[in-house]
């Protein structure tokens, strides 16, 4: 039996670290369901790993729904989180609509990339009763506009923004926050 998405926040409150891996298909999900992970992520990285795109920006909602369904069919004990792909959260109402689609496909939680600029969408998703995971640091959906993959939080200004964004997302009610390519000393402060 799957735990409730609220178990992720409870783990944080208890000082536990979360363990997760990425899955894009049924057989992988079946195998990983036996590993005792906190959740599986159906990542938009499937655009590169499965579909052969150069980055995640070309992944569609249809791609995410298809792969979320496959992963959800493969688990009985592990929560499933699904990425909201690039462009799927342009407005709070669009973010809610697309989050509902991922939930209908079998996701227990959705994951959204971005900080305070995404707070209206984050709050709308959570207000609709959909559990959410934030994603800060290097944001793959912005790799084209940022000119590549770069460590975040090295400068004082970046570090302060990451901390501020994490606090805002946490206070909004996110179940967890993914930190990607965050400067190690700053990341250590989060965990």
Regions found by a protein language model. Name each.
Residues 2-191:
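Alpha/beta enzyme core
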């Amino acid at each position: 039996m799957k735990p409730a998405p609220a178990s992720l926040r409870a783990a944080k409150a208890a000082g536990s670290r979360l363990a997760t891996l990425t899955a894009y298909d049924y057989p992988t999900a079946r195998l990983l369901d036996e590993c005792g992970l906190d959740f599986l992520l159906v990542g938009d990285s499937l655009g590169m790993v499965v579909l052969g795109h150069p980055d995640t920006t070309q992944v569609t909602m249809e791609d995410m729904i298809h792969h979320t369904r496959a992963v959800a069919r493969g688990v009985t004990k592990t929560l499933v989180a699904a990425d909201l792909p690039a462009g799927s959260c342009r407005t709070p109402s669009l973010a809610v609509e697309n989050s509902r689609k991922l939930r209908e496909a079998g996701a227990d939680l959705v994951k959204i990339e971005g900080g305070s600029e995404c707070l209206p969408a984050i709050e709308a998703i959570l207000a609709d009763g959909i559990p959410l995971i934030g994603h800060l640091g290097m944001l793959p959906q912005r790799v084209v506009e940022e000119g590549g993959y770069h460590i975040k939080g090295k400068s004082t200004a970046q570090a302060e923004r990451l901390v501020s964004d994490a606090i805002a997302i946490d206070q909004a009610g996110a179940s967890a926050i993914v930190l990607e390519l965050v400067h190690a000393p700053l990341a250590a402060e989060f965990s």
